[in-house]
């Protein structure tokens, strides 16, 4: 059972913040899933993308906001989709 403090904090957290945290978490989990499947380390990904390992680490720890452009670059480098959006028909 959650404490009253945790319940109050959750109740006071704006919906867009909850959505952001959920989506960011899903994206990071997907990136880590792809890295593991391909046998890549964060350092190897950094080298492949000409980035510092610390920058990759910040992306995957939520310390740096991932832009759509960054996600597209990650998808191109990893050869796998990270996010999927239903396309308009």
Segments from the language model and where they lie:
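DNA major-groove recognition helix of helix-turn-helix/homeodomain DNA-binding modules
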Residues: 69-84
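Helix-turn-helix DNA-binding elements, focusing on the entry/boundary residues of the two helices
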Residues: 42, 53, 68-71
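Short basic helix-loop element that most often maps to the first helix and adjoining turn
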Residues: 29-48, 73
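Conserved N-terminal glycine/acidic-rich loop preference
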Residues: 20, 52, 89
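Recognition helix of helix-turn-helix/homeodomain-like DNA-binding domains
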Residues: 49-65
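N-terminal flexible/basic segments that precede or flank functional cores
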Residues: 1-33, 38
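Short, charged recognition helix plus adjacent turn
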Residues: 39, 85-89
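Core residues of bacterial helix-turn-helix
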Residues: 38, 49, 60, 77-78
């Amino acid at each position: 059972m959650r404490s009253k403090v945790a319940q109050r904090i959750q109740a006071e957290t704006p919906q867009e913040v909850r959505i952001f945290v959920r989506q960011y978490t899903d994206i990071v989990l997907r990136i880590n899933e792809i890295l593991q499947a391909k046998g890549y380390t964060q350092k190897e990904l950094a080298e492949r993308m000409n980035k510092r390992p610390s920058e990759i680490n910040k992306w995957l720890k939520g310390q740096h906001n991932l832009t759509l452009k960054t996600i597209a670059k990650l998808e191109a480098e990893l050869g796998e989709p990270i996010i999927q959006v239903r396309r308009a028909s």
